[in-house]
């Protein structure tokens, strides 16, 4: 019997090949798209969730009270405090980049990414040791000049033939400190934030922080820090206790301490991620909507096919078939199509995995992805069977009880609303994606045409390494296509503020007012050479520099932008004084502030991505190391100059050192809009897929519907109806469905688009024509899809139709 069901199922698959093809391909696309999105979300939110204590492990970060800036980590002395003074804490671990230039057996190792950790690190994040000391991979030593080191398999195989050969090797840094490899551990998984080449242990307890006052150590730069709480700890109470710990105990009056689950660390503290978590969630929800669109299409086509087979079911019933037999046949046919859709989905994944990894900047384990696809397929199969069987159960009941009237009665009373609802849902999802894609396109186009406020053309950004700074600035002058080297200091184009301060003072500043002010510390001629427009006063000049200034600042003249001038609330800010505290140069509270004279006001310019409003900004001279250099090139010589700069950096960078990151400013701007561009591609693709699935589905349904209604149309023509009236009647039906779908989907799309646009200070305004354009586009799309079928049916010969029946 089962064999007969399968044979009949494949026969019907071929008989209704167009509908079957649309069902299988559409379902395969929906299943694959949603599965990839779900896998991506699960992968990105499971970082380091595989460690035994991950459920109770939290990352510690701090917020500077002065600047409001979030900093990953905390002063290292907090780790000792947590281990000794907080009973809620099971383990507290800290780690930090070690730096260093290493050699081993006269072999240059270069600057691997080593991190020093405290003794709790391997308890909290136990590594998989593959060679060496299994029980204590990095024993702590009292002598800081001689430490033990555990390295990854990748690092060991880079310099030695086997992990075992690396054991016992001694690495010596530039200070003649040595590190002995005592263990080789397995490479960290790709979904882990711990990606160092090696780790060595140091002691971190309060006895190591007694030579100076606690306040001194609490002003140290932050280190990475993680805490594992006991199982029954009240996390909220612990968080409140930790939040103001340093302030209440007068250890650091400018430091708030916060915690976040380790699985959220990557996105909560990673401001420069290619994709934020909201985008990934949007991807998943969009994939789910596409899946529902394909499921609605599948259900519509399946139910329509079953009604087309009403005579077959009536004949089966008359020959003794019972409900069970009919249900089994339908279940087998749906199962065959879902299985074929899964096979197509597997093929799509195999073909597109490299492209998906590159596009989404992620790593894909195919075996896990295939399991997710199978689970999604089972979910879809269950949902399809439940809905289809529920819909047709009454139809089969009618066939059993009313041999003559059953099929036609059910068709006229139930099939129509099923068809209309299903088509409407598909069109609604399609309309939502089309509207969103339109808004995204307009917003991105506006962003690309927004002036940054400085000349971004023919400009190269270099994140310069300190090892090559002097030689680079000397030799860059010899490249003929480069006309100028601009000291950028801390200025860089990014999503996040790189340096902001709140404790900036000026005359008549409102009491208790707090403003986050961006500080640009760069070369004396930075604003002039970046071609930032001067509105009042003058630029900074060489004569403003004071080489003998005791604070080390070197210049007490500054420029401000329009936003900062508005805060000063004065008609002429030129000559006004502002004050600021600089804890790096002037110490802690109680030290007199630094005073600066405003000599010029420049036009507002974007130093951050266009997701951010232009902040009040102060430009001051920076007398220290430049993190960024900007190279101005001859017009049209940008690519040639970029190639020459990269060759220079490659030539002068010592062996083993990372190369300085170099790119054009316009390329950097493209990176900053990567999420927006990816969102546009996503919703455009979804709109196209939904439109195609809907078009094929509507075409198939309309073809079947016209075939079923040919007798009705013939009778109407005999009774005097013209072909034009029949065409208008049929098109009116589909137009009403389309209007209803737009009436529901467009307000939902508006709410989503408006919420998305709120993150941009300069955004497009949603106008009436945007709604009208989508409405007209969908009406035109539907009419063109069904018009051919309707015209053929309306122009048919009614006499032949009546005779054939």
Where are these regions (language model features)?
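Membrane-helix entry/capping segments
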Residues: 3-6, 11, 15, 19, ...
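Intracellular coupling helices
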Residues: 6-14, 18, 22, 26, ...
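Generic structural signal for small/hydrophobic residues in well-ordered secondary structure
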Residues: 13, 23, 44, 60, ...
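Hydrophobic alpha-helical transmembrane segments of multi-pass inner-membrane transport and secretion
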Residues: 15-42, 276-311, 339, 418-443, ...
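Small-residue-rich transmembrane alpha-helices
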Residues: 32, 36, 258, 334-402, ...
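Membrane-proximal extracellular/periplasmic loop immediately following the first transmembrane helix
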Residues: 37-101, 115, 144, 214-230, ...
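Mid-to-C-terminal secondary-structure elements
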Residues: 118-135, 149-275, 474, 478-672
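In a subset of proteins, long, contiguous C-terminal domains/tails are tracked
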Residues: 616, 627-630, 641-654, 659-662, ...
